[in-house]
Each structure stands twice: as C-alpha cells, then as structure tokens.
Amino acid sequence: MGLTSQLLPPLFFLLACAGNFVHGHKCDITLQEIIKTLNSLTEQKTLCTKLTITDILAASKNTTEKETFCRAATVLRQFYSHHEKDTRCLGATAQQFHRHKQLIRFLKRLDRNLWGLAGLNSCPVKEANQSTLENFLERLKTIMREKYSKCSS
C-alpha cells in the first residue's frame, strides 16, 4: 500500500507533462501543415482563386479563435463543394484541369486541419462581405503565422 501512494504523485506529474507536450506538439504540427497548405494554395494562380468567397475573417472581431477557424473551414467547404465541378474553374487545357483538381485537394486538406484546430462540431456562418479566394487565403495565412509564432514561443 505504501508503495502505491508513493508512486501516485510522480505518475500524475508524468501524465500532466506528457499531455502538455503532446498538446503543444500537435499545435505545432497542425499549424505547420496549415501554413504549408496555405503557402501552396497562395502560390497557385487558377481560375477559381479569383472567384468570391464569404469573408468571415473581415468580421471576426467578436468571435473566439476556435469560432474563426470553424467558420473559415465552413466557408472553404461551401466554396470547394460548389466549385469542384464548376466549368469556369476547370479550364480548357489539361494543365488548368490538373491545377484545379490540386486546388480542390488542398482546400479539402485545409478544411480538415481547420476543423481539427477548431474542435467544434458546427458553427453558423452569416452572409458577410465577399472577398476573392486568393485574398481570403492570404489573410488566413497571416493569422496562422501569427498563431504559430505565439504557439512556438
């Protein structure tokens, strides 16, 4: 019995430390993946990046960070679901078609990572200002870089 009571405090300490390490490590990995995806997306110049998207980032002053990430994921999902087979985005050449498919794949990856970071099941998105997908992704990249600098320091 005495041995068990002596082992409990160190075990709790190890569990607490491991949980903090994993959480911080996950934060870094997820943010790195999001930033990497955003870098790839913003380098691409496709027909779809000039189309408009609901700009939830412009009106995110009274929302939590998790709500912002959730809403960003929601509008990205709405965008790629609507434009996945959009003939304006597919282009006339095989290269344009390939770039469009790559864009959709990156948007889906970004959506999945933002949902994971948000940790919410759903979030309402009100119609707000419109922005091009290109500008939306640039602003989201700035937000993620700021979060990464805070997370890693």
Swiss-Prot record:
Q: Where in the cell is it found?
A: Secreted
Give the signal sequence positions: 1-24
User: What InterPro entries does its record include?
Assistant: 4_helix_cytokine-like_core, IL-4, IL-4/IL-13, IL-4/IL-13_CS
Q: Which Pfam families match?
A: IL4 (PF00727)
Q: List the disulfide bonds.
A: 27-151, 48-89, 70-123
* Keyword line: B-cell activation, Cytokine, Disulfide bond, Glycoprotein, Growth factor, Secreted, Signal
Q: Which residues are glycosylated?
A: 62
Entry similarity comment:
Belongs to the IL-4/IL-13 family.
The identity of this protein, by name, is Interleukin-4
Q: Which organism is it from?
A: Macaca fascicularis
- The gene name reads IL4
